[in-house]
């Protein structure tokens, strides 16, 4: 009987990516198969996020539930990973001594070894160090699960915004070697992946070493990924205004695989608040980037992150944010009330704003962006949109669900053999959270670009033989 593994994931897309790699690692090393039933699991892993308020209490609440299972089934292994594990490792050991394994985002590759050690020594094991690129060197071959895939190209953050814990929990910025990234994406393309989402805390800060000792910029990487046959759509998240340079903007002019949608966090429209946040840009500088982007790609739509109620935020500061939202005409946002993160400078800033005022500001901001998003959706009515078919519709299994470049779900009638392919649809109806369409043409009638096959890309990419000697085919 196979061993069972349950992974509970909280947080960002990077955590989702990490959890998928944990599952692959434990399957390859020990034959663990995923389950959604805690009672079935031999290993219970919690991949945590420390961005939101009360993250630690949420972790201990979940661990309390799992302790009940461990009391009934003493052999079950409980592990805590992610950013809360890095921040609170010693506290977890003290408050939840029944936890067997504690690991950080940069040490998840050691999971099979750590689980085995905890079982053989009957003692907790903890590793929350930052071994830089070692994590990526130790991950298993990628496995495609559908037509879209996430690929982590860099880790960490070196910006140290005053409100953010990421530099303390994921370490400084470290970029994966260019060849490793391209090799992974080519493997995924061979397995049928059509869209890749490049991940990093500051993904456009990517500076990946190449086989010949040079450095590959993010703009260069985008063009190389776009050249792989089968990869016909590229997204990336999360980017930072500081590194959103003109060479990246130029890629939008000549690379159709790069979607006309960008998530570029600004956090506030007030220069005073941006300075307090230690954000290295002003509102005008942010708008300048957007103007250049829209010149290069007129139909591009922008989403952002916003923090309301930051310590010291005045009515004028908030109105500056609202003005920026209207000026840029954002299509979407992730917006939150400020919550102090332990260990960050902003946690010690005095704040005299009432909770009621913070909630009112958040509501006003979200209502404005929702109105802008609905206007964008209505503008799509009657237009043709190229969509990637993801699977059956969640509301009607007899229909298909697809996604537009600007991240909207479209439901339409079609046969199951279209799943994993691109189709052009005409938008016939607009709803609050989705669109409806009808097929205009299928992929066989499209002129999708072909440059280099996945097999050729893998052959060109640096590998090492069994002795660890690097090889490269130019």
From Swiss-Prot:
Subcellular location: Cytoplasm
UniProt catalytic activity: N(6)-dimethylallyladenosine(37) in tRNA + (sulfur carrier)-SH + AH2 + 2 S-adenosyl-L-methionine = 2-methylsulfanyl-N(6)-dimethylallyladenosine(37) in tRNA + (sulfur carrier)-H + 5'-deoxyadenosine + L-methionine + A + S-adenosyl-L-homocysteine + 2 H(+)
Keywords attached to this entry: 4Fe-4S, Cytoplasm, Iron, Iron-sulfur, Metal-binding, S-adenosyl-L-methionine, Transferase, tRNA processing
Cofactor: [4Fe-4S] cluster
GO molecular function, one term: metal ion binding
PROSITE patterns for this protein: MTTASE_N, MTTASE_RADICAL, RADICAL_SAM, TRAM
Purpose: Catalyzes the methylthiolation of N6-(dimethylallyl)adenosine (i(6)A), leading to the formation of 2-methylthio-N6-(dimethylallyl)adenosine (ms(2)i(6)A) at position 37 in tRNAs that read codons beginning with uridine.
Domain TRAM stretches: 378-441
Quaternary structure (record): Monomer.
Annotated Gene Ontology cellular component terms: cytosol
Family: Belongs to the methylthiotransferase family. MiaB subfamily.
HAMAP family (UniProt xref): tRNA_metthiotr_MiaB
Pfam families (UniProt xref): Radical_SAM (PF04055), TRAM (PF01938), UPF0004 (PF00919)
Domain of life of the native organism: Bacteria
Protein name per its UniProtKB record: tRNA-2-methylthio-N(6)-dimethylallyladenosine synthase
Binding site for [4Fe-4S] cluster 2: 157, 161, 164
MTTase N-terminal domain span: 3-120
Domain Radical SAM core residue range list: 143-375
Co-factor binding comment: Binds 2 [4Fe-4S] clusters. One cluster is coordinated with 3 cysteines and an exchangeable S-adenosyl-L-methionine.
InterPro entries registered for this protein in UniProt: Elp3/MiaA/NifB-like_rSAM, Methylthiotransferase, Methylthiotransferase_CS, Methylthiotransferase_N, Methylthiotransferase_N_sf, MiaB_methiolase, rSAM, rSAM_horseshoe
CDD domains tied to this protein: Radical_SAM
Protein's organism: Vibrio vulnificus (strain CMCP6)
Binding-site residues for [4Fe-4S] cluster 1, renumbered to this chain: 12, 49, 83
Keyword Repeat: no
């Amino acid at each position: 009987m196979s061993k069972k593994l349950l992974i509970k994931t909280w947080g960002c897309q990077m955590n989702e990516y990490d959890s998928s790699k944990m599952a692959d690692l434990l399957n390859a090393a020990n034959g663990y198969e995923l389950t959604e039933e805690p009672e079935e699991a031999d290993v219970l892993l919690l991949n945590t996020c420390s961005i939101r308020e009360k993250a630690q209490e949420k972790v201990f609440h979940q661990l309390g539930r799992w302790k009940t299972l461990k009391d009934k089934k003493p052999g079950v292994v409980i592990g805590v990973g992610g950013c809360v594990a890095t921040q609170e490792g010693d506290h977890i050991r003290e408050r939840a001594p029944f936890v067997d394994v504690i690991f950080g985002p940069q040490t998840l590759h050691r999971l099979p070894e750590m689980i085995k050690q905890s079982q053989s020594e009957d003692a907790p094991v903890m590793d929350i160090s930052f071994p830089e690129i070692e994590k990526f060197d130790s991950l298993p071959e990628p496995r495609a699960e559908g037509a879209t895939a996430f690929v982590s190209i860099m880790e960490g953050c070196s910006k140290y915004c005053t409100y953010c814990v990421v530099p303390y929990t994921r370490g400084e910025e470290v970029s994966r070697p260019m060849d490793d990234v391209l090799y992974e994406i080519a493997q995924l393309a061979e397995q049928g992946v059509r869209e890749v989402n490049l991940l990093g805390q500051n993904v456009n800060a990517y500076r990946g070493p190449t086989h010949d000792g040079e450095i590959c910029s993010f703009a260069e990487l985008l063009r190389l990924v776009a050249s792989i046959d089968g990869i016909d759509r590229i997204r990336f998240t999360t980017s930072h205004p500081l590194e959103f340079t003109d060479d990246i903007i130029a890629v939008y002019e000549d690379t159709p695989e790069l979607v006309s949608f960008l998530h570029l966090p600004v956090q506030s429209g007030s220069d005073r608040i941006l300075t307090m946040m230690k954000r290295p840009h002003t509102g005008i500088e942010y708008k300048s980037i957007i103007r250049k982007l829209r010149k290069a790609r007129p139909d591009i739509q922008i989403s952002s992150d916003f923090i309301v109620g930051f310590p010291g935020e005045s009515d004028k500061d908030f109105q500056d944010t609202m003005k920026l939202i209207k000026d840029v005409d954002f299509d979407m946002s992730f917006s939150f009330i400020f919550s102090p993160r332990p260990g960050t400078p902003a946690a010690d800033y005095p704040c005299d704003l009432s909770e009621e005022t913070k909630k009112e500001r958040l509501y006003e901001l979200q209502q404005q962006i929702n109105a802008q998003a609905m206007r964008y959706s209505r503008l799509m009515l009657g237009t043709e949109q190229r969509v990637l078919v993801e699977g059956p519709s969640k509301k009607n299994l007899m229909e298909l669900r697809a996604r537009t470049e600007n991240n909207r779900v479209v439901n339409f009638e079609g046969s199951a053999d279209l799943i994993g392919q691109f189709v052009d649809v005409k938008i016939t109806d607009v709803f609050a959270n989705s669109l409806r369409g009808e097929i205009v043409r299928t992929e066989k009638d499209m002129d999708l670009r072909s440059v280099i096959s996945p097999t050729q890309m893998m052959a060109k990419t640096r590998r090492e033989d069994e002795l660890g000697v690097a090889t490269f085919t130019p």
